[in-house]
């Protein structure tokens, strides 16, 4: 079985359980990439294996993080800019090493964004005071090697949850 779990503006991980003597089990190694389809509406996403355990029942338990976690290893130099579009583009242009990710946003804001000390690209996006998420609000979507920062992810279908009508119990 394979389960992908994505938390809003948080973790994005894969858990795979398969027989230790399964068809491609020998190819599962830490650092390797698994391409998995997180949902019916999304394209397959790459996940890098970070942990493999073998419980007593002879099955491998593989844990992997979305490829976007590579952004933890890309350092961004200090800079300051106004606007969300300028902020996400500035992160890419001030990266200290090659950054294979593209960035995109639909957030229209003229707020100031500042990286005052060198920090990881992913922390600059969300995970520290003054991050893109902290400064502009919004929701991240990790789509392969594209970082999308939405004003609001998904759609509002104008459905109200009312106790006793469409909610019967807690």
Language-model regions, residue ranges each:
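Short amphipathic beta-strand/extended segments with alternating polar/hydrophobic composition
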Residues: 1, 46-50, 158-166
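A generic "functional-site adjacency" signal
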Residues: 10, 43, 58, 125-126
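Short, ordered beta-strand-loop transition motifs
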Residues: 4-13, 51-60, 141-145
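Intrinsically disordered, low-complexity sequence elements enriched in Ser/Thr/Gly/Pro
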Residues: 6, 46, 149-151
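Juxtamembrane "anchor/assembly" segments of surface/extracellular structural proteins
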Residues: 1-28, 65-71
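Short, acidic/charged, Gly/Pro-enriched secondary-structure junctions
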Residues: 19-54, 82-98, 130, 134
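Surface-exposed or flexible loop/turn and strand-edge residues in extracellular/cell-surface modules
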Residues: 11-13, 44, 156
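Charged- and aromatic-enriched interaction segments used to assemble
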Residues: 59, 65-170
């Amino acid at each position: 079985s394979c389960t992908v779990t994505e938390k809003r503006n948080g973790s994005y991980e894969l858990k795979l359980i398969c027989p230790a003597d399964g068809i491609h089990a020998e190819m599962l190694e830490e650092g390797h990439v698994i391409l998995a389809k997180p949902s019916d509406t999304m394209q397959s996403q790459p996940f890098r294996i970070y942990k493999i355990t073998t419980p007593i029942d002879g099955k491998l338990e593989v844990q992997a993080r979305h490829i976007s976690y590579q952004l933890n290893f890309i350092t961004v130099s200090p800079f300051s800019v106004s606007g969300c579009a300028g902020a996400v583009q500035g992160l890419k242009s001030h990266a200290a090493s090659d950054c294979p990710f593209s960035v995109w946003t639909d957030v229209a804001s003229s707020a100031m964004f500042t990286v005052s000390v060198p920090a990881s690209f992913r922390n600059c996006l969300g995970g520290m005071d003054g991050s893109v998420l902290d400064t502009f609000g919004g929701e991240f979507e990790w789509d392969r090697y594209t970082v999308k920062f939405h004003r609001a992810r998904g759609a509002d279908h104008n459905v109200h949850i009312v106790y006793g009508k469409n909610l019967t119990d807690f």
